[in-house]
């Protein structure tokens, strides 16, 4: 399968970055949200790039191509390239050495599937060759995307143990992309480990909740969160009918926005 051809793939800034990072003629790969959104027909905003090159080599190659390289997350292998006013996040392939639910210690790798295995959901682990547009799918992300099914890669409990924020990301991604019931294994794992959210900073939780509430209709996902007691450990003051009240508010706001002025 291929990415649909689109103007963003022909962006001269992207072409410059891709050409600078070729290894033995092979380009780096686009990964994550850009691939997912392109396949869904959603406008692509941010383009993230994965490469087997280590950060020092990424910086060297970018600078040789007169592209600004900013070491925004160099300990985790991430360099931000600034080309023609556009920014691209470039990350070296990685494997997790240890995790504590808040942060991971990583080491760099050269295996694409190993890098994919450390990601959260199957449709976020899709890679694409920016030149041939070939898609690389290691965990059946394409079929899950087609079915609008949000599924953790491998064992849901293990994915949550690696990063507790994935509990809330599950509901955000389901609210945005999912159809039907939330994946049963994912929901069970989220409910079991909900108390681990208390180990995270309030800033990270608040940011994720803002993202959830910014989707078109977050109310059903919020209600599932409430029904499963996931807010109880860190937001006990939220009333049980908050989901239905949020749905009513969205309905009123939608109706108000659609009225002729």
Model region roles, listed by residue range:
Residues 1-261:
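Catalytic cores of the polymerase beta-like nucleotidyltransferase superfamily
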